[in-house]
């Protein structure tokens, strides 16, 4: 996308992963009480990508260029597409309720609840069989880290709803809304979901799993991908 001049659209994942220029999280699901990665990522370009190609490279018909380009944007708006890029999504103080990195779902709060269920199942299943024979247990701890923090990006997405805004890059004469605050109901649901992640049952590693993580072996030092610790 960058090669042909397209920017990231970090609001695309809320609309059926409409762009390859978003960063969605791998899509996991529970099938018959087992974690499935069958649909981890989409294939091909999304509907928003088709909009950007049409806007940038289409042959203009026998009409004014401005009229044609405005019609492309209006059709995109009617289809529910929204374009929000890096400066609004990456910033730690970002307030857009739809623009996030490595998130999924039409609703950040509901997706957080869903990913926590998958995380719980993954932790229940975690065992020494998650590493190869003859690998040190120190590796097992590092394998556990991304599972333990599986919900971290969805937490970032959800917390932005609290005091958050839904806004667009609007020009004078445009038909899309300029901005509106997240409703109090949306914010309350987001707050409750965030507080749930602070429960001991979520934060605490089950005691039977702690036995899998002895002090680090010689030569296997901690990195930024490891838990912080002194043993």
Indicate residue ranges for each PLM-predicted region:
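Conserved catalytic/binding loops enriched for acidic/polar residues
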Residues: 13-231
């Amino acid at each position: 996308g960058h090669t042909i001049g397209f920017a990231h659209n970090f609001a695309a994942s809320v609309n059926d992963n409409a762009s390859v220029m978003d960063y969605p999280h791998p899509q996991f699901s529970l099938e018959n009480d087992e974690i499935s990665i069958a649909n981890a990522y989409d294939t091909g370009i999304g509907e928003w990508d088709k909009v950007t190609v049409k806007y940038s490279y289409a042959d203009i018909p026998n009409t004014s260029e401005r009229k044609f380009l405005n019609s492309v944007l209006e059709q995109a708006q009617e289809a529910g597409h929204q374009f929000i890029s890096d400066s609004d999504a990456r910033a730690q103080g970002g307030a857009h309720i739809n623009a996030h990195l490595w998130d999924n779902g039409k609703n950040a709060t509901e997706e957080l609840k869903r990913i926590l269920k998958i995380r719980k199942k993954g932790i229940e299943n975690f065992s020494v069989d998650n590493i190869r024979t003859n690998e040190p247990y120190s590796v097992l701890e590092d394998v556990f880290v991304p599972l333990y923090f599986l919900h971290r990006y969805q937490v970032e997405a959800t917390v932005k709803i609290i005091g958050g805004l839904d806004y667009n890059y609007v020009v004078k004469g445009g038909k899309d809304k300029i901005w509106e605050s997240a409703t109090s109901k949306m914010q309350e649901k987001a707050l409750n979901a965030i507080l749930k992640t602070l429960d001991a049952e979520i934060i605490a590693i089950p005691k039977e799993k702690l036995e899998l993580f002895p002090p680090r072996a010689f030569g296997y030092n901690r990195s930024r991908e490891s838990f912080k610790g002194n043993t």
